[in-house]
Amino acid sequence: MPPKLDPSQIVDVYVRVTGGEVGAASSLAPKIGPLGLAPKKIGEDIAKETAKEWKGLRVTVKLTVQNRQAKVTVVPSAAALVIKALKEPERDRKKVKNIKHNGNISFDDVTEIARIMRPRSIAKELSGTVREILGTCVSVGCTVDGKDPKDLQQEIQEGEIEIPEN
């Protein structure tokens, strides 16, 4: 048997969920069961936390567990932030599969997303993070200020577009 867990110890558990939906408790059980938490209750807490802002989007949720209490924090991916910035109507995940988004977001939105993602980015400078987010825009299928995100990446690379560091 594994050793008993110290109840005052802080443990972080990461789970991918669809916003606003109660995930299967069976998928949560192996991760949080040993920590002395009820998977069904945690599933409901996650659904409640993600229902407002992230409904229908796949996001990562960080569960911080201490003293058999779980604190839910949403850790959105770059793609989730880009799709949220598109402000598209919510779709039924079960009916519509493999969606190509064809909206348009502003370059200011892209830099704002880059600032949010900056701590998790590998890039040395903010301009590199902005280029990462533009790459995500390509994958999502949206345009930025009516232009192809690849063209904007090229302009940043060549120094035609300046991105302030702060």
UniProtKB/Swiss-Prot annotation:
Signal peptide: none annotated. The gene is RPL12B. This is Large ribosomal subunit protein uL11y. Pfam families: Ribosomal_L11 (PF00298), Ribosomal_L11_N (PF03946). The keyword Disulfide bond does not apply. GO terms for cellular component: cytosol; cytosolic large ribosomal subunit. One of its GO terms (molecular function) is mRNA binding. Keywords: Ribonucleoprotein, Ribosomal protein, RNA-binding, rRNA-binding. Gene3D superfamilies: Ribosomal protein L11, C-terminal domain (1.10.10.250), Ribosomal protein L11/L12, N-terminal domain (3.30.1550.10). Belongs to the universal ribosomal protein uL11 family. It comes from Arabidopsis thaliana (Mouse-ear cress). Binds directly to 26S ribosomal RNA. The keyword ATP-binding does not apply. GO terms for biological process: translation. Interacts with ABI1.
